[in-house]
A protein has these predicted regions:
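Short beta-strand elements at the ligand-binding edges of bilobed clamshell
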Residues: 88, 143-168, 213-215, 281-293
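Segments of small-molecule ligand-sensing domains
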Residues: 315-330, 340-394
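Extracellular/periplasmic periplasmic-binding protein-like sensory domains
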Residues: 255-331, 390, 394-403
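Beta-alpha junction/loop-to-helix N-cap segments that form part of ligand/metal-binding clefts
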Residues: 25-34, 43, 58-65, 73-144, ...
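Extracellular/periplasmic bilobed ligand-binding domains
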Residues: 127, 193-293
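Periplasmic-binding protein-like
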Residues: 48, 103-116, 135-137, 179-183, ...
């Protein structure tokens, strides 16, 4: 028995000595052999609910890339290593319910996604019942956050974009009147127009601040009558919500008439496909649009955050300096940054309940890649926004709107 003890002790000493040969200090040895086992329990799950496959998978790619890029920059949340756990909703409503339940069973501290408001709405009851906070990335349907106190978003809804463009007309352009040209029967366009009008009337104290308001049929080809009516009003800014194909057609026809008017649109105009639809006679002075992120242009100090620099550096390293990050990628990045930050602000072992409490705090605020971000009581963001134009095949910010309630 004594001989056996000697053999065991000798073996332990031999193993420790061998390990120490590769470690210059005891701290290195401790990190290599002791802390490794302890760290395996210091892991926190951030769930990702996205259409990895199916018809929407291509559209969701930038959201996912943004999340993954942020994870590479910030692999830890406080003292815990983040484990990204994906659940594929397969671009299907029924599959989303299963994917959400599967993800919830993993007990994530927070969930990110999904691309497509319809999928987030399908997952919402399960997320609400599990009391797990979630952050949608590009969902513009107001019901995503309105019907679930645990759901947040990092993008503006359509009506918010109308409000932002109203601020731009008054603050940036110093104008007191504007017009609206929108498609019939488009609820999102109507919500955007209503918010635009409210902002102008409020800021100018003028009930007649919307001097032109007219509707057209989606897919309409000739806008000569509408454009001539706009000319007669003398307004210099026209809100143009709706499909960007119609918007591009209207802007092109207005340019042919040499109209001294700037058309204002939503974030869909940042898509390169919109730029390609514009006629050769259209200049950057003919239109502006809202963007959630800007890599260059007229930026305020609120927009130039440390996280923005980290994001751009990581993006350029991964995708090259010649390319430009999309809004969706920057928003996906920020959704992860908020999740990791909220986890890091908890005490003790993080869980969904603690993270939900952090995000529900009215004083919660963070500087993300897209600027300053906090949330209102519904879970929608109060954040920096950018008024942008296409210049030399790239988007360039011409006016920054600081976060405002």
């Amino acid at each position: 028995m004594k001989t056996l003890k000697i053999i065991v002790i000798s073996t332990i000493v031999l193993v420790m000595t061998a390990g120490l040969c590769g470690c210059t200090t005891f701290d290195n040895f401790k990190a290599a052999f002791i802390d490794k086992n302890q760290d395996s329990g210091r892991e926190v799950i951030i769930g990702v609910l996205e259409p990895v496959t199916g018809s929407e998978s291509k559209n969701a790619e930038d959201e996912i890339r943004g999340i993954q890029l942020a994870n590479s920059v910030h692999p830890n949340a406080g003292d815990y290593r983040v484990s990204l756990v994906f659940s594929d909703n397969k671009s299907d409503i029924d599959a989303t319910e299963t994917a959400a339940q599967t993800l919830i069973a993993k007990e994530p501290a927070i969930i990110l996604g999904s691309y497509g408001s319809v999928y987030s709405l399908s997952a919402s009851p399960f997320i609400r019942d599990a009391k797990i906070p979630a952050i949608s990335i590009t969902n513009t349907n107001p019901l995503v956050t309105r019907n679930n106190k645990y759901y947040y978003r990092v993008c503006y809804v359509d009506s918010n974009q109308g409000d932002l463009l109203g601020r731009y007309v008054v603050e940036g352009k110093k104008e007191k009147k504007a017009g609206v040209l929108l498609p019939e029967g488009d609820d999102a366009a109507q919500a955007m127009a209503a918010a635009f009008g409210r902002r102008l009337r409020s800021e100018t104290d003028n009930d007649d601040a919307i001097a032109f308001y007219e509707q057209y049929k989606t897919g309409q080809k000739d806008f000569t009558k509408e454009l001539n009516r706009i000319k007669r009003t003398g307004v210099k800014s026209i809100l143009l919500p709706g499909e960007y194909a119609d918007a591009a057609n209207i802007i092109t026809q207005a340019a042919k008439l040499n109209m001294d008017v700037e058309f204002l649109g939503d974030t869909t105009w940042s898509d390169g496909s919109f730029r390609k639809l514009l006629g050769d006679n259209v200049t950057s002075e003919d239109y502006s649009f809202v963007q959630f992120f800007s890599s260059e242009g007229e930026l305020t100090s609120q927009a130039i955050t440390k996280e923005r620099e980290l994001f751009l550096s990581a993006y350029q390293k991964e995708y090259g300096k010649g390319s430009e990050p999309s809004d969706a990628m920057a928003l996906g990045y920020d959704a992860y940054v908020i999740a990791a930050d909220a986890i890091g602000r908890t005490t003790g072992k993080p869980d969904a309940k603690k993270v939900a409490a952090v995000l529900a705090d009215p004083g919660y605020q963070i500087e993300g890649a897209t600027g300053l971000i906090n949330f209102n009581s519904i879970g929608d963001p109060i954040k920096t926004a950018y008024i942008t134009k296409w210049k030399n095949r790239k988007t360039e910010t011409v006016y920054t709107l600081d976060a405002q309630e």
